[in-house]
């Protein structure tokens, strides 16, 4: 046993004393490095745009004074004492001209208008065959503005004659002279209004229709001329309360729509006949006009009559507020009207829709 052990030792020891190879040295890979990103991305800010304010135009006081003095001297030389003067750009050249009205002596006197552009004198003349010319009375109703939205400034001269006749003359610079663009005369006056919400004024010529009523002919600019586009009845005076005439079938129909336009729904309901009122209670009937903004009636004519019953036709424009949009609808309406102890009353109607549009800029 001992021998075996020694042999084992002898055998083992040389092995233990043999030289060992050097260990391989491993160079550790370097740890990766990162450049930290900014928490918020940055960019070169765009320069804030700056604007150079346009200087406000200034008037040369000396030039203005000289212009006024020259104008006064020219008027004095012409022997004219103006009723009023305006200083406006009437020909679109960027410079103002003098616009004035004065009264020419005569029987009766005649209203006259002129434009003084530097040394150039322009008379604004009515048609030769006009009975009243620009007017018979001293007035100072004068406007310079783009009345029909055509991009040009028109000169509007208002006048009056006899008891209630209203006159309107519209002039325009045509490149060489001031031409008469349009002329209107109504025995109950003339007025401007944007009737259809298109930002261009229509011309309403008013005529007496009797019984506190006027009939209006509405004229609209078509790009070249004014033309008749609509007619309607309205009150001569705006004072309330109004008397609803029912002495004729036509008056009953007119009164009904004027009451609706006045928002006098009880008054309008009272113009319905007994059968109509029996068919629909007042509260329920009035609810049907909850969205109505305005109503206009024109072209009213009695077609025929048989005993105490008449047939009346009319055209009606109704304006309704539908979800914040004003919608205009044109109707043909035919009414059956019956004579009662209290006058003519509306019994039943048939309607036919002719047109519908949105009044985008309803006044």
Region spans (language model):
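Structural motif
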Residues: 107-113, 163-169, 211-218
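Beta-propeller blade termini
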Residues: 81-90, 137-147, 187-197, 201
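Core segments of small alpha/beta cavity-forming domains
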Residues: 89, 95, 107, 138-139, ...
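Short solvent-exposed beta->alpha transition segments
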Residues: 115, 119-124, 166, 172, ...
């Amino acid at each position: 046993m001992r021998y075996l052990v020694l042999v084992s030792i002898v055998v083992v020891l040389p092995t233990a004393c043999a030289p060992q190879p050097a260990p391989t040295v491993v160079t550790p890979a370097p740890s990766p490095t990162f450049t930290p990103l900014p928490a918020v991305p940055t960019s070169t800010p765009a320069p804030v745009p700056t604007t150079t304010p346009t200087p406000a135009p200034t008037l040369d006081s000396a030039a203005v004074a000289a212009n006024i003095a020259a104008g006064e001297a020219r008027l004095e030389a012409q022997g004219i004492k103006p009723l009023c003067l305006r200083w406006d750009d009437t020909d679109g050249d960027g410079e103002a001209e003098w616009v004035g009205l004065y009264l020419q002596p005569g029987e009766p006197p005649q209203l006259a208008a002129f434009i003084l552009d530097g040394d150039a004198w322009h008379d604004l003349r009515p048609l030769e065959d006009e009975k009243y010319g620009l007017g018979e009375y001293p007035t100072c109703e004068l406007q310079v503005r783009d009345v029909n939205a055509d991009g040009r400034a028109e000169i509007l001269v208002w006048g009056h004659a006899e008891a209630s006749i209203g006159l309107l003359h519209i002039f325009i610079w045509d490149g060489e002279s001031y031409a008469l663009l349009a002329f209107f005369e109504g025995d109950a006056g003339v007025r401007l209004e944007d009737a259809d919400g298109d930002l261009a004024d229509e011309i309403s010529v008013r005529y007496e229709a009797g019984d506190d009523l006027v009939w209006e002919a509405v004229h609209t600019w078509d790009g070249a001329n004014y033309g008749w586009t609509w007619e309607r009845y309205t009150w001569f005076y705006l004072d309330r309360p109004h008397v609803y005439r029912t002495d004729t079938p036509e008056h009953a129909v007119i009164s009904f729509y004027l009451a609706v336009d006045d928002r006098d729904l009880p008054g309008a309901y009272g113009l319905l006949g007994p059968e109509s009122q029996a068919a629909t209670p007042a509260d329920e009937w009035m609810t049907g006009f909850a969205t109505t903004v305005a109503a206009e009636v024109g072209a009213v004519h009695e077609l025929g009559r048989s005993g105490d019953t008449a047939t009346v036709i009319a055209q009606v424009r109704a304006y309704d507020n539908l979800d914040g949009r004003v919608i205009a609808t044109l109707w043909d309406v035919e009414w059956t009207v019956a004579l009662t102890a209290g006058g003519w009353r509306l019994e039943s109607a048939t309607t036919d829709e002719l047109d519908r549009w949105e009044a985008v800029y309803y006044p």
